[in-house]
Amino acid sequence: MITPFNLEEMTRIMIENLYKGNSRKLINKTHRQLAEHGNNLVNVGEIEYSTILEIGAGNGELFPHINQNFKKYHMTDISDWGKTEIDLICKLDERVFFEVENVENLSYSSDHFDRIIMTCVIAHLTEPFRALEELRRVIKKGGLISIFVSTDPSITLRLIRKLITNKKMKNLDIPYKLYNAIEHRNSPTSIIEMVKYVFKNDLINVEHYPFKLKYWNLSTHIIINIVKK
């Protein structure tokens, strides 16, 4: 989407704002939830010494929540706006790499990764269907894909924003509502239907949070775990 705004810079500011106060606790909780299923598979030996791909690494905020029993960890993002923080992670752990990648056209070979983790990216994409096809292409048979889906504009998410996050976003160049309207262009229902089609021959598990009710409008986010058959 073409706009007159510097959305990359506003995203950086927004993330800095989210990692302050109570919202930081909520964000870290969602990271743990996104990593949980894959970590459990590692703990029981179903995924061992894996090569991991993270889509939407940002400034590396998900990494501390990932089980550290892996062979290689590829952090990727559409730009290098968070590279300063990620470089520190790479220096401390030589198994970690950062690469600028477009999930709609990944440079990796097919059947390359054991585990793929996509942070809050799918709602932002211009070509989400193509991105899902790319994820399926580069994951190995038996590999796990974990996808974070924002439920914007759900009632629950809007309430959380009103109570906690909106007041933090006054330093953005545009209203926070407009930022989300531009960035979260793909609805949760459309994303789920695309996932069901692209991964129709695979094992799909859809979990709603913070409640277990299967209604996106009563959720703040959805996590989809897929095992390629």
Predicted features and spans:
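Conserved class I S-adenosyl-L-methionine
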Residues: 1-46, 49-58
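S-adenosyl-L-methionine-dependent methyltransferase catalytic module, highlighting the catalytic core
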Residues: 24-26, 126-134, 144-229
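Class I SAM-dependent methyltransferase SAM/SAH-binding core
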Residues: 59-105
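A structural alpha-helix within SAM-dependent methyltransferase catalytic domains
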Residues: 64-67, 132-136
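A short acidic, Gly/Pro-enriched loop at the edge of an enzyme's catalytic core
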Residues: 104-116
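A short SAM/SAH-binding and catalytic strip from SAM-dependent methyltransferases
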Residues: 115-126
